[in-house]
Amino acid sequence: MAIVKRGGRTRAKQQQAPAKVNNGLGAGAGAGGGIQKAEFDITKKKEVGVSDLTLLSKITDEAINENLHKRFMNDTIYTYIGHVLISVNPFRDLGIYTLENLNKYKGRNRLEVPPHVFAIAESMYYHLKSYGENQCVIISGESGAGKTEAAKQIMQYIANVSVDSGNAEISKIKDMVLATNPLLESFGCAKTLRNNNSSRHGKYLEIKFSEGSYQPIAAHITNYLLEKQRVVSQITNERNFHIFYQFTKHCPPQYQQQFGIQGPETYVYTSAAKCITVDGIDDGKDFKDTLNAMNIIGLSQAEQDNIFRILALILWTGNISFVEDESGNAAIRDDSVTNFVAYLLDVNAEILKKAITERTIETSHGMKRGSTYHVPLNIVQATAVRDALAKGLYNNLFDWIVERVNLSLQGNQGQSEKSIGILDIYGFEIFEHNSFEQICINYVNEKLQQIFIQLTLKAEQDEYVQEQIKWTPIDYFNNKVVCDLIEATRPQPGLFAALNDSIKTAHADSDAADQVFAQRLSMVGASNRHFEDRRGKFIIKHYAGDVTYDVAGMTDKNKDAMLRDLLELLGTSSNAFVTQTLFPPNLLSELVDSKKRPETASDKIKKSANILVDTLSQATPSYIRTIKPNQTKKPRDYDNQQVLHQIKYLGLKENVRIRRAGFAYRSTFQRFVQRFYLLSPATGYAGDYIWQGDDLTAVKEILRACHIPTSEYQLGTTKVFIKTPETLFALEDMRDKYWHNMAARIQRAWRRYIKRKEDAAKTIQRAWRMKNHGNQFEQFRDYGNSLLQGRKERRRFSMLGSRAYMGDYLACNDKTGFGRFVVNQVGIKEPVVFSAKGVILLSKFGRSSKRFPRIFVLTKSNLYIIAEVLVEKRLQLQREFALPVHLIKSVGLSQLQDNWVAVCLLSPTTTTPDVFINLDFKTELVAQLKKLNSGLSILIGPTVQYQKKPGKYQTVKFAIGSGPHIPPLIDSYKSGTVTVNQGLPPTSKNPKRPRAKLGKVDYSKYYNRGVRSLAQPAFQSQPTASYRSEPAYPQPTTQLYATQHQPQQPQVPTRTASRKAPPPAPSTQTAAQVSTLPQAARKPAAPARPAKKIAPQPPVKKAVSPQPPAKKTVAAPPPPPPPPALSKPKHPTYRAMYDYDGSVAGSVPLVKDTIYYVLQINGKWGLVKTMDETQEGWSPIDYLQEESSPSASAATQSYAPTTASSNPVSTASSNTYTNTTQATTMLNGSLGNGLADALKAKKSEETTLAGSLADALKKRQGVTRDDSDAEDDDDDDDW
């Protein structure tokens, strides 16, 4: 993008940093940078505890537990430790995973919303898009803590926010990803004592995203260590995998007939544990979800039939039972069962019987093949072979389902490089009897804990040391020693190595292999304090607690290889799904021909765990630490001891301590500059990177431009460290709003241009209409006057030439303001024709009538009378009456100049009565009513009659009076009589509208962007001791001299005055002097910034050339000439002795000790005007005391000359005042001889002072221009 620079730009302007946008730590600020309140809009309940454990006052395990307990009992299950999420399983649905809740986390950082798993998912997806880094989430915790549910919700969130509903292929991938949850839960989860939906396998789901749009285009699932032992045996009150109960309870009819499926109580594998039905598990609904997931993923009907055929085969295999024959060997109890199993497997029944009751042994002599023997098995051995067949079938079936799902999810992976990984793996387990499955599960959890330690604790501290960041080291437990105890091979072999060696030594006899393994344990843990050897058992001190493992059967489980007899049996099957898919021919050949030791289960889990660690290390991790609050699986049951134990072994206290002492964000200098260079005008311009220096200096410039305090960051050798997440969020928010602000700036410039064009067009149109058709408001005024012409005395203000009938005086038709508030409050929907304030005469019981203030609003249909009332000490507006215009029969007025009007209806009622009102714009109201209701009668006479109540007439008399009790221009009501002063004759007419004075167009309204207006001074001078009114600021000296005294000089084009002018010189005129000036001189002055390129000049003759400005000297300029003598005020001045509230209509309130003009005295009332002549009205003369003259001492103090020690700014200010005072006095024609002589004598000094002032203003111009965009050629394009 090309850089287009505006002419005359200064370097200071170009490098000025953009204003920091402060929006309350959250997104949602407006384009104009306005501060908006950040609030938690998801829940309105009071925050319980702290949402981030780093905010705890005491960092102890007990304090963490207490905070989690409070939040858990308040149904708040999520808490942060920095960016780590702590989740406590509620064991019930809290309604926090709805689509509405999900949408509230889209595009929000974690501080704007309460802690939630959705916030973690949003953070992962945001960093994937913003930084292009692979993401993963590690969910850890013991079994039943809620890991699987957290993984499901993360998948749901990412699929929802990343998918374009218009792309069918993307939507299909999303649906398939979500469908993997119910499918793999059915085949891989089971009910245990601790968890009704415990994952009995590990799963790492990797969702791949497209470049640019970051939408899911593929996915891949990695499976880890299925607990296949559960297929054949479970402890009491546990269940087999969910799919067996779903299938047997709700099997379709065709499968019942084809596969002979019956209820779960029929099969040994589903009924032995005596737990068929579980509260909270709906097997029927789950089975429908499983079938639906199969269809979404794309499993054909044939593939589904094969799956359920294998499930039926496994169930019927478990029902094969044995008895002892005469030789003590195992024999089939019921041949019908084996025959049906052979039917399902598509093998010969006799071959099946031999495979599970006999064992084939081959002997060899060197390279020669030996003899083959068929050894019969006893009942225990035959049962083990039967179970091995069932476990092998289910394990391979599960692996095939995962591969088949991956085949459907592979999509177009060639376009994908970025991914988000979700790890859902079995949690830490401690049972009464722990075997090989538990040591594998706990080993994987140890590896995950090691990743957490390396990536959050150790790596963080190591990085601080490497980057030379100030840091206080914190001790922590590194569990690498436990991982080495299990997986190491050298120098000290671990448990897995010992298991493999035991199998190699005694491979034929499982019991002998267990004994060898028990002997090797003494060498494994000889020097490891985390290991204890017991007889037939051993203890490993895991990070989550001590676990005792049984040696018996561990070596046999580690073999993880099907017997050769079983593989040969499966090879004879006629079912291609079995022989080609589940058990391909190469399995048997590898088992027979391979000279290498077969891969054991420990080898597989170790290999898978290391691959998982490498995968997670290549991504940016997020962490969710789940906590199980009880063992009863009941809601609102919180076991403090159990939770405290988990807090300790999860290391939450150490995590909090490191988090509070560390940094929330770190990045290399290059990446930080690439991300945030837009935030500084020195590094970025219009989206282009323009920095020429090194990255470290660019980082400093960006942080300086964004006003980030040094306490919030540290700079290392290669990275920048941001301490708090709030600072990072502020930087991200400013970056997000950069282009938005640029667009808003262009829009403002365009709207400003359009506004000027519209205003100019309106001005021309208004002048044209007035020339051709006259002023409609004045025409309507003349129409209203004609209605009363010759019949009613008129008030002086009604006959002004500038009086026009504008109608809506309260601005009810505007979109904002008091008038709009009024109509909204009372529910007026129609356009308003007339609105004004006034009073109404209401009678009170037991006393005479009294005036009450009211608001009058007239529409085309109704005349509304609105009252302001106090309700519970709050002012409210209430509609008192709504009088239909077409029902108004007449209006009554007197012949005098009063403002009373009686509005009479055809049939008055209690809700729509006649009213007797008083308002200044009575004539205009009558004219509007007459215009809307042409049949309206206007009754004018010495009395006015109206119905006080329906059927009860009230007559009000009017009389001319005088005296102290009747203020001028104000009437007095008493006992049914209104007394008023004499008014203007009834035949009076309005003179022509006075011509407006010509003046320069004020363009400041086009640049109102939060700075001071041109009409407002940059500061307010202190009022004098005698007066409270604000001072009037003088006109700029340059304009007065150039206009009045040098008309012969050619005009120099000037630039439009700056929007933000420098402060003018303080005025030292007293209010008395200001009052003596003519009206033209007393108008508000412009700021004291001169027009460009025009220096102030003294008055000179035509033949004399102006003297060049003298050079600057260090000597202080001479003091200004003395002020002119104080002239006599044009009106008598009075001091207020008491406060007066001005409650009477037409009066002016008085403030004690304030000076006022008194224009006229009539009895006990005086016509009072404020010193600034903004208010005029009647006030009691007894409250005032006449002043002899203005305070001379105040004036003398105000005109004190500037001393030689005054600074140049003060000198220039005094000089500006002097020039202005002289010019103003010359304009008024009242220049004294003494002042004229002083001016002539000081001609050269004034020229020097004027030049100095011009130079000072020119220097100041560069500063003020930077803060102003009022120039016509400045379109706010400084990016």
UniProtKB/Swiss-Prot annotation:
Q: What ranges does the record give for the region Disordered, renumbered to this chain? A: 1-25, 980-1001, 1014-1132, 1189-1216, 1253-1279
Quote the CDD domains the UniProt record gives: MYSc_Myo1, SH3_Myosin-I_fungi
Here the segments flagged for biased composition (Acidic residues) are 1268-1279
Q: Which Gene Ontology terms of cellular component type are present?
A: actin cortical patch; cell cortex of cell tip; mating projection tip; medial cortex; myosin I complex; plasma membrane raft; prospore membrane
Give the UniProt record's GO annotations in the biological process aspect.
actin cortical patch assembly; actin cortical patch localization; actin filament organization; endocytosis; filamentous growth; mitotic cytokinesis
Biased composition, class Polar residues, residue ranges: 980-989, 1018-1027, 1189-1209
Q: What is this protein called?
A: Myosin-1
In what ranges is there compositional bias, type Basic residues?
1-12
Q: Where is the composition biased (Pro residues)?
A: 1116-1126
Q: What is known of its domains?
A: The myosin motor domain displays actin-stimulated ATPase activity and generates a mechanochemical force. The tail domain participates in molecular interactions that specify the role of the motor domain. It is composed of several tail homology (TH) domains, namely a putative phospholipid-binding myosin tail domain (also named TH1), an Ala- and Pro-rich domain (TH2), followed by an SH3 domain and a C-terminal acidic domain (TH3).
Q: Which gene encodes it?
A: MYO1
Q: Which one of the record's GO molecular function terms can you name?
A: microfilament motor activity
Where in the numbering of this chain does the IQ domain appear?
Answer: 740-760, 761-786
Which SUPFAM superfamilies would you find in this protein's record? P-loop containing nucleoside triphosphate hydrolases, SH3-domain
Alphabetical list of SMART domains matching this protein: MYSc, SH3
Provide the residue positions that the database annotates as binding ATP: G141, E142, S143, G144, A145, G146, K147, T148
Q: Which organism is it from?
A: Lodderomyces elongisporus (strain ATCC 11503 / CBS 2605 / JCM 1781 / NBRC 1676 / NRRL YB-4239)
> Residues where Phosphoserine occurs?
S371
